[in-house]
């Protein structure tokens, strides 16, 4: 076994922005594919068979395409996510500036539950119709609107200074993580399997905190959550490039958008605790 393993090629990744073309690689190994979102027609057969190449990369993914396709995909995804974030900021600002909005929303807290159900329904619809143009854009717009209203309800619970500071910190962190991931050749998807367990830990810690209401524990949970979503953002960006086809831009946008919102919520609570 030692002799055989010594001849196996180590996984190699390239700078996603560099000029290379691995579309002619033939070497494949059978491996379970963890991708949850649908892939292109060209690569779905490989996904169903669990086939990836020697680098652990799905054939037909963005990372295996030429530089022009990679850059075009990134521009499209980041452009859509940027529009989603700007729209969300606008809705949050509009809700925040409603007179006595925080008291109104606390009095009618039930408004959050229809948003939650709507988000779940739209996530399912986006999964099914991810490549059905223009329906996928309509569903994405509706999903963004629902999330924007939800975020608007959240930010009304905090002072404007805290919200602005958290938004700036989140923007700097996200930009740094994007730059690091796109320029790095490491395989970040190896940590994907452990994310589910860590998210469960975060969920149960949040439930625990609801009953005991300890400021110190709440701060630790939020710091842990912020770190977790930073790692998840890096992993998702890596998965998007090496487990998604160029046709899966809608799924990519949803993944990144939700990661950024979750990171913002954690940073918002950390900043609020620090300013007390």
From Swiss-Prot:
The chain crosses the membrane at residues 78-98, 110-130, 136-158, 163-182, 189-211, 216-235. It holds the Pfam family Bax1-I. It is found in: Membrane. GO terms for biological process: endoplasmic reticulum unfolded protein response. It is a multi-pass membrane protein. Keywords: Membrane, Transmembrane, Transmembrane helix. InterPro entries: Bax_inhibitor_1-related. GO terms for molecular function: calcium channel activity. CDD domains: GAAP_like (cd10429). One of its GO terms (cellular component) is membrane. Belongs to the BI1 family. This is Transmembrane BAX inhibitor motif-containing protein 4.
